[in-house]
């Protein structure tokens, strides 16, 4: 089981170079958790780039049985705030996690799972990265 960040979902949706590696990681994991906040952030980005029709495709993707949408509970809320204090945008830390990032981080942290992501921001935190992810 793994957690997916917005950046990983977008790489799959927009057929970015990491797409095949991310799809393989999702298939290996059998179950991929996604914060409901991550879903909102993903929809916002997709809508801004490609419009509402593309958002419908994202929703279809996330309805596949390999994905589980998880709303933040009290533990995730506390972990997201702690991540903001430690790694959040505007705090001078090189990770500079944004609001959406905080909830993917929190879900992975609370569940003790690795995070599937693209880019260097999470590499500057204490969260484990999915093995084999680019």
Model-derived features: positions:
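Short secondary-structure boundary segments
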Residues: 36-37, 73, 119-120
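Active-site neighborhoods of divalent-metal-dependent phosphate/nucleic-acid chemistry enzymes
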Residues: 68-114
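Glycine/charged-rich beta-loop-alpha catalytic/anionic-binding loops adjacent to active sites
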Residues: 24, 60-62, 85-91
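Short, well-structured N-terminal submotif of metal-dependent ribonuclease cores
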Residues: 1-34, 47-60, 124, 133
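Acidic, PIN/NYN-like endoribonuclease modules and their adjacent C-terminal/linker elements
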Residues: 105-134
């Amino acid at each position: 089981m793994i957690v997916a960040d917005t950046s990983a979902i977008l790489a799959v949706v927009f057929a970015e170079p990491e797409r095949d590696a991310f799809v393989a990681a999702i298939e290996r994991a059998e179950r991929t958790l996604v914060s409901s906040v991550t879903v909102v952030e993903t929809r916002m980005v997709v809508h801004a780039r490609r419009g509402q029709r593309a958002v419908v495709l994202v929703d279809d993707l996330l309805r596949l049985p390999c994905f589980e949408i998880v709303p933040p509970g009290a533990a995730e809320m506390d972990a997201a705030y702690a991540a903001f204090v430690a790694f959040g945008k505007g705090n001078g830390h090189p990770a500079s996690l944004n609001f959406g990032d905080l909830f993917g981080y929190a879900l992975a942290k609370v569940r003790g799972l690795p995070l599937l992501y693209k880019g260097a921001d999470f590499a500057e935190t204490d969260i484990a990265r999915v093995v084999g992810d680019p």
